[in-house]
Amino acid sequence: MSITYNPDDPLYADADDVSREIDRVFDICHGCRVCFSLCPSFTDLFNSIDAHDGRVSELTPEERDGVISECYQCKLCALRCPYVPPHEWLLDFPKLMLRAAIQKKNSDPPPFHVRLADSVMSRTDLSGRFATAFSGLVNPVVTSKGGLIRKAMESVSGIASQRLLPPYAKRRFSTWFKRDHVANRTATGNPGREKTDNPMRSVALFPTCFVEYMDPEIGKDLVGVLEHAGASCTLPSGTQCCGAPWLHSGHIEQFRQTAAKNIEALRESATNGAQVIVPQATCAYVMRKDYPELIDSSDARVVADAVREPMEYLIGLRKGNRDLFDSLFPPLQKEGSADGADNDLSIVYHVSCHTQAQGVGLKARDLFGVLGFSVKLVNKCAGIDGTWGYKSKNYALAKKVAQPMKRAIDDAAPREVCGDCHLANYAILEETGLRSVHPIQILARAYGIRSD
């Protein structure tokens, strides 16, 4: 038996070794059960073990495969588990489930249509470039959930035809930044937009697929707020999708190739002390945690150490110079925002799984509190977690997973909902009918900030 999560280890995808490790971990989990309510994997695992009078060795292959396929890599169990490293048992349930899925894929390759769907879903930059160029034709199809064309697309892409999908933008974020914003910055000479020798105020933007191709308005608000705070924003060339779809579908080599390109694109900025701002929780998690583990290089570690989510970066600025920050972002009053607009300052903040899994705390909640907002947390999974909840084979279960989140938001009856995960935000819209925005957009509106 080998406790390895290194894909280069010869035993990583060895069927017998994986099976023995699954027995070991399932037996430990059976005796602990602290994660019993987290996800369908644990519910089915414990029910199946109980049906066999507590004997893990008697689980059927189908029962094991069900537990593996229902793990959507939310990582929350790893946060709760008392037996993760450095404990001597070295337990890491999500990594083992990924290892088991990869071993099964290697020993029993899925049918062609599944492999095709994984490939299509993982090539987000290719589809994004095409869709933004032809958004007028693509959007009526993409947004017509349950339609005939979406059903036909499901067989190729693997994306559930019933799932609400975001439309594509007419213009990419990078196009706006390079052609419009940089030119305007040069023309105006705004002091808050000049180069700085302070590393904390030098940021490299990693826009993510969603901001780049689907909602560049988030990126514009992000740039506006960062520059209002005195940061100098750059957009390094050569970045692409973080690689999460490849990783979560078990294609390690494709993930490594993608990660290596992003590391190379961001290496110089990170080495020079710039913070890498990533406005999407899943992408930030992958770059922080998976890059240095699966790309064992000093550059990968430098980039990972530089990654920050937007609200995390801003609250870091405040810790560095509270007086300056508070002069730029004075606490808001209950009767209105900084520019006098009506605002009751009451918001619901959805805490995504991958926000929690990064282990840096709830920085959006903390900053909102400092600025005078009244924040209600909804700490329930949206059932998306990367691409898992978008796949047709997982759709029914994903909807079930999302119901506690829906009930919590409905009960809060919020005027405003926000969350760091764009995919979860669309699940919120689908489940509740309420549009959830990125926290940075709440700040931009409250302080009347807009980037030209």
Summary of predicted features, one role per range:
Residues D9-H30, L59:
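Asp/Glu-centered strand-loop micro-motifs enriched in Gly/Pro and often flanked by an aromatic residue
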Residues E21-F42, E63-H87, L91, A100, ...:
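Cysteine-centered iron-sulfur cluster-binding motifs in ferredoxin-type domains/subunits
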Residues D17-R20, L59-E62, E88, S298, ...:
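A structural signal for alpha-helical segments
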Residues D8, D17-V18, D50, T60, ...:
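Generic signal for short, ordered secondary-structure residues
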